[in-house]
Curated annotation (Swiss-Prot):
Name of the featured protein: Histone H2A.V
Record keywords: Acetylation, Chromosome, DNA-binding, Nucleosome core, Nucleus, Ubl conjugation
Entry GO CC: nucleosome; nucleus
Gene name in the database record: H2AZ2
Lineage: Eukaryota, Metazoa, Chordata, Craniata, Vertebrata
Signal peptide: none
GO MF term set: DNA binding; protein heterodimerization activity; structural constituent of chromatin
Keyword Metal-binding: no
Biological source species: Oryctolagus cuniculus (Rabbit)
Length: 128
């Protein structure tokens, strides 16, 4: 084998690449989140390797939580498609998510709420 690279890679099969998302057992893209964290920091792109994994895990958990609650809301209304209205009902119905997500949801509508002092007691007659 003239001019060959016989010593290098002699009979070993190259291992298949495993993504960081697969290693962490996540669905969200750890590599992409790491890239976005690097471009949006002021410390010259220095971001720890576990920061992206942790951020991806948090985003995945919050997304799963919101989608589960919105799915329950759509099931209660007997429809199969989640709409912005279902997302709005799910987020505003959960106290912790409501405090976390203060954004206005386009197409979400208004949350029905009647103050307790306006609701009459049972058997109480309205006087005219």
């Amino acid at each position: 084998m003239a001019g060959g690279k016989a010593g290098k890679d002699s009979g070993k099969a190259k291992a298949k690449a495993v993504s960081r998302s697969q290693r962490a057992g996540l669905q969200f893209p750890v590599g992409r989140i790491h890239r976005h964290l690097k471009t949006r920091t002021t410390s010259h792109g220095r971001v720890g390797a576990t920061a992206a994994v942790y951020s991806a895990a948090i985003l995945e958990y919050l997304t799963a939580e919101v989608l589960e609650l919105a799915g329950n809301a759509s099931k209660d209304l007997k429809v199969k498609r989640i709409t912005p209205r279902h997302l709005q009902l799910a987020i505003r119905g959960d106290e912790e998510l409501d405090s976390l997500i203060k954004a206005t949801i386009a197409g979400g509508g208004a949350i029905p709420h009647i103050h307790k002092s306006l609701i009459g007691k049972k058997g109480q007659q309205k006087t005219a």
